Amino acid sequence: MVKYLFGHVTTESTSKTINVVASSKTKLVGENQGIPNSPQKTIALTAAVGKMVYLDIEVDNEIFRCLGTVTDIKTHNLMMTSQMESVGAKETAGALPKGEDFRKLTFSIQATFNRPPGETKWKKYSSALPTSPETRTAVYFLDDETVQEMVDEDDIYPTVGFFRGLDTAPQPLAIPDFGGNTGATHSAVIGRSGSGKTATYTYILGTYMCHEHHAIMVIDPQGQWSNENGMVMSLQGMAESLGRPVSVLRVAEDIKLPMDEEIFSRMVSKLNLWKKFRRMGTENLEAFSDAVASGIANLPYSEYDKPPRDLLSKVFGSIANSSSALNRIYTRGDRQDAFRDDLLRLAGLPIIDPDTGEQALVSKEDEEEVEKNWEAILSVFSPLINLFSSTNIDGGKRHSLGGSYGFLKDVFQVRNANSGPAPYVILDMSPSTKIHAAADLMGGKDAGLNMQKILDNQDVKALILMMVLDEMKRASETAFATTNTGNLNTQIVFDEAWRFAPEGKATPEIEELAKKLEGFALDTRKFGIGWSYILQSPADLKTGIWRQLTYVYVGYGLVGDDVKRLEALTDDVKQLDLYRQFIPPKSTGIYPFMLMGPVSPIIFTTAPAFVNVFNNNQDYLHYNSSWINKITERRSMPRITVEKLDPNRRVKTPKQKAVQVEKQYSVGNAKTVSTPQTTIKEPVVSKKIIDDDPDLVEDMPF
């Protein structure tokens, strides 16, 4: 075994901190170091800061091995006394005696293993040595072979990159499984744009798949995880290749939202649905939105599948004929009467003169005004009510999240040894590619193609997320209550968390969602549901959530107060000096990350681990091949290739598709329907579409 000698223990070392003196010019490489007459040679001194080192000592016939990280190093020279330095300030450097440089440092012990006499396996011992080491004890650089000695070969330790400064030694990770009695843990990945945080967490999520019963659900506000555009690796391809069910659920197309009267009313108000119908005060508008939401919520769900104009006409007529509803909107008689007449015109109902009892005549100008109002209202209401209907705007089927037949029943389950692999699910909150393309072609004017405007509204998206989270909470509580055999073992990843779970002032909808997320993190952990948040700064995350985090993965770019906030997560703040030395990945192509929390099996303290994240899928597959191949072999599946993890191979070419676009033109109560043919380019963006068009895909991973 080759060891790379770094230096030797010097005086004043303790059982917790080791003082080391290293040569300033060379280091020794020896075969069987420590054995007399073993071969040795010298090589050039290499960088030391940021690398892990170790030493062995013998106590009571047992071998103890401690490990630590070099955080800084200082140069010394016994000839360079303060007096000589003063002389050197006035004379040339050549006039000074050279002496001999040496380097000195102190590192804190982060883990200690022991090996009893006669045994070959190392055991975890403590975060300190049983005694201080002798001076001149050799200190070596950590290498891959030594790491493999330390970890139990029976345990699964995936990896996402190399030890910092050791490009041949992968950093093993103790990836937690949430199926035990301890419950789940929460985590966050943080870094500025370009730090590689999405790529890093893509690899981390891939390593979680070593636990076959660990379900993963990604809440995807922008559609990045569903379409995998710009991703370093296809997690969908990874999951499929490991035998996991994969689902991409798009709010715009696939999910039928549960009707919530209060939230629907707030959506209507946020979308300013009535702005072209009538000028109304804020309180009047809110009361009207409440009345409409109440009317819709009290209708059977089957009504939501009817033409939006028919549905809303029925609600308008009900409000117009309800004195109590009108009184809540307007108290003044003249305004109330005028408002009632406007509703009756929109509903296509007769207006009766209270004095004569005769039906008021409807002029051509009135009819034209009604149609203009309907066009403005339906441009917003049609896509909004479609989120609650059984079919999407393209005629595809929507399904509920909750209930016995909802999507979530396959996510929140207590799994056992006989269960199949847990699913990988992406909940896409963005407008779908189809809807974007069609809306662009139609100039955004068609009422059925304005879903983009709704789902691009951050406050409306927050309201939708509230409904989704409530469904998730109900489904998880039901699943957990129906069994006493274990936890739900699920991880929920929340991308763009800084938008929806911020600390500080935001819109009422965002603040309410953030508070709800804080409560869910606390309540669902005991069910075995862990949350992971992707954001740019620790200050962007609500404090109540931040305090619940067990793991924090930090990429390049944090400064000032953000770094100070990280100090509370470790008892060795000197380690953060290594983080401050990170350089922009854009300039090097290397993505350094600091992993905080009990993530490394060879660190027993709160000190972070440092890793250079893989920048290619070939390395990821190679260094994770042990656990990946065990799964594929057990399930009689082919081995995973680099090509199967390429996110850019999922689509062969854009597809030309004829889309039926229905426009309705109304004159009075008569309607004329025309169905022009429109051709749009539509990328294949979901498994549903791929199933319909198998010729579009070559060598797909599912």
Task: List PLM regions with ranges.
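Conserved ATP-driven motor cores of ASCE-family P-loop NTPases powering translocation/secretion/packaging/pilus
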Residues: 515-605
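Switch/connector loops and helix/strand junctions flanking conserved nucleotide-binding motifs
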Residues: 79-80, 225-230, 257-258, 500-502, ...
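Conserved nucleotide-binding/hydrolysis micro-motifs of P-loop NTPases
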Residues: 113, 222-226, 431-434, 498-499, ...
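Glycine-rich phosphate-binding loop of nucleotide-binding enzymes
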Residues: 159-253, 565-572, 625-635, 644
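Conserved P-loop NTPase motor module
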Residues: 588-702
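P-loop NTPase motor domains
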Residues: 219, 223-234, 261-519, 526, ...
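Basic- and hydrophobic-enriched, low-structure N-terminal and domain-boundary segments
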Residues: 1-191, 200, 204, 486-488, ...
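Conserved catalytic network of the ASCE P-loop NTPase/AAA+ motor domain
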Residues: 181-182, 208-211, 418-419, 481-486, ...
